[in-house]
């Protein structure tokens, strides 16, 4: 890099149904959370079950789930060097309602006890 020009990466996002958002260029200093905000804003309105917040999304690149607080530079590795166009896979977490989350908490594993009977 010379002359203060910041490195940029060209990224497209592959949605669960196989369609794409992008490609678009992002500065190397962009965080994964920033990418997710961009995805939420660009999510096609005609698609059902879209994300409401960045926490509803997971980004996967080169088989790794990317952490929200990491920058693109920090996500680079020998496997994922962001050279050329990079495709990241988007996974949308199914929204859970309060009723569903209460059911999960309410279900406790039953104690398994042995019973002996003398005949």
UniProtKB/Swiss-Prot annotation:
Keyword Lipid biosynthesis among UniProt keywords: no
Q: Where in the cell is it found?
A: Cell membrane
- Mainly localized where? membrane
Residue positions of covalent lipid attachment, annotated as S-farnesyl cysteine: 116
What GO cellular component entries does it have?
plasma membrane
Q: How does it sit in the membrane?
A: Lipid-anchor
Which key words are in the record? Cell membrane, Lipoprotein, Membrane, Methylation, Prenylation
The propeptide sits at 117-119
Q: List-wise, which residues carry Cysteine methyl ester? A: 116
Q: Which InterPro entries match?
A: MUB, Ubiquitin-like_dom, Ubiquitin-like_domsf, UBL3-like, UBL3-like_ubiquitin_dom
Q: Name one Pfam family in it.
A: Rad60-SLD_2
Classify the source by domain of life.
Eukaryota
Can you give the residue ranges of the Ubiquitin-like domain? Answer: 9-75
Q: What's the stated role of this polypeptide? A: May serve as docking site to facilitate the association of other proteins to the plasma membrane.
Q: Which PANTHER family match?
A: MEMBRANE-ANCHORED UBIQUITIN-FOLD PROTEIN 2, UBIQUITIN-LIKE PROTEIN 3 HCG-1 PROTEIN
Protein name, please? Membrane-anchored ubiquitin-fold protein 1
At the highest ranks, the source species' classification is: Eukaryota, Viridiplantae, Streptophyta, Embryophyta, Tracheophyta
